[in-house]
Amino acid sequence: MVQASGHRRSTRGSKMVSWSVIAKIQEILQRKMVREFLAEFMSTYVMMVFGLGSVAHMVLNKKYGSYLGVNLGFGFGVTMGVHVAGRISGAHMNAAVTFANCALGRVPWRKFPVYVLGQFLGSFLAAATIYSLFYTAILHFSGGQLMVTGPVATAGIFATYLPDHMTLWRGFLNEAWLTGMLQLCLFAITDQENNPALPGTEALVIGILVVIIGVSLGMNTGYAINPSRDLPPRIFTFIAGWGKQVFSNGENWWWVPVVAPLLGAYLGGIIYLVFIGSTIPREPLKLEDSVAYEDHGITVLPKMGSHEPTISPLTPVSVSPANRSSVHPAPPLHESMALEHF
């Protein structure tokens, strides 16, 4: 009897400890920054699994894959990623887009390392997943050798490499320009004062944008246009056995898909804001209490799932002190997705 009673008390105690641990984990996961980190991690993982899987089909068996299939895989992978995380982090899935939004004041800099870390880990895990799923097919195709160049090269499944007809600096300009086009169009798609995508279609339209870039302009460099898409899988291939040639190939090409997209996204965002955003007539925002405007995080350009104070320098704000005491602050706007972040 004594033993049975002690056993029951021990069981109840272990259950209480278990529930306490679960509650603590849930509390941590509900923190905004943690949720945004996990959102970037999962959305990037989803995008990269579909994208890299489509490349594996094209490289390993032409019967099942094609260049069009690669573009569709990455494009609709982006669409699925936006659905996974659009209402939590904005589903950037791209360190260059995160950098541009931070540099242009749309996202606080403190979120930059959190978002990029989530993206890099998701991309790395996606590369490991594709390697595991296609391991036997890779070895069969290459005769058991993990090659970076040559007719049985398989490193290109995971990262982009400079083709023979391109020079390093032409490739740099190509990557910067394509990423600039991406960012410019993303701002257009989500600009509520211009001609944005219809509510609920943003994810699909952004996926189509990626497909268009690929089928029209992707031949020269494989259109990485995303440090989070290229560098983590490249690091994985180095660890998995492809060797240091994954970094040295193409005149040390590896750094170009990291640096060029950052520059391109920033310039593309500036070009849109200066030449398009600043020329659109915008009605003054009717906020009577400027203090409430600053304190409650009211954003002129509506964005989903984020209450960070984001005031566009291009939007005039009309403030009247006449009725400060009688006016209640307006709530944050949520009519559109936060995909200006993408």
Swiss-Prot record:
The modification Phosphoserine is found at S20. Residues 90-103, 222-235 dip into the membrane without crossing it. Changing Y135A: Strongly decreased glycerol channel activity. Mildly decreased water channel activity. Pfam families: MIP. It is a multi-pass membrane protein. CDD domains: MIP. Its main location: membrane. One of its GO terms (molecular function) is glycerol channel activity. Changing Y67A: No effect on glycerol channel activity. No effect on water channel activity. The record marks Y135 as: Important for permeability to glycerol. The record marks F74, Y223, R229 as: Selectivity filter. Detected in the sperm head (at protein level). Detected in white adipose tissue. Keywords: Cell membrane, Cytoplasmic vesicle, Lipid droplet, Membrane, Phosphoprotein, Repeat, Transmembrane, Transmembrane helix, Transport. Aquaporins contain two tandem repeats each containing three membrane-spanning domains and a pore-forming loop with the signature motif Asn-Pro/Ala-Ala/Ser (NPA). Homotetramer; each monomer provides an independent glycerol/water pore. Two homotetramers on opposing membranes can dimerize, forming a cell-cell junction. Interacts with PLIN1. This is Aquaporin-7. The gene is AQP7.
